[in-house]
């Protein structure tokens, strides 16, 4: 049983999500910069599948996903991926301006 709990905790940390946030927004409602769309959706599907088999295990998943450690890790990932996305968008704009300015396209 201990290995099962460790596996579930590792899965939740890997997905870095909180289940209630997944249900609050659909995939199409999210912005371009939100890289957490796919882990959130996957966590939602896993939660729903576990809930149909064992509501008690689903409640355990929900409790683990709402811990401060998981929320902190998720917030860190969101913050860092947002920074990376902004930098990539700035780089693309610079490349476009060089392309249009120097080459005249």
Swiss-Prot record:
The stated induction of this gene product is: By steroids (estrogen).
One GO biological-process annotation of the entry reads:
lipid metabolic process
Keywords of this entry: Signal, Storage protein, VLDL
Signal peptide residue numbers: 1-24
Q: Which InterPro entries match?
A: Apo-VLDL-II (IPR008404)
Which is one Gene Ontology cellular component term of this protein?
A: chylomicron
Q: In which tissues is it expressed?
A: Produced by the liver, secreted into the blood and then sequestred by receptor mediated endocytosis into growing oocytes.
An example Gene Ontology molecular-function term: enzyme inhibitor activity
The answer to keyword Heme applying to this record is: no
User: Which protein family is it in?
Assistant: Belongs to the apovitellenin family.
* Reported function: Protein component of the very low density lipoprotein (VLDL) of egg-laying females. Potent lipoprotein lipase inhibitor, preventing the loss of triglycerides from VLDL on their way from the liver to the growing oocytes.
Oligomeric form and interacting partners: Monomer.
Protein name as annotated: Apovitellenin-1
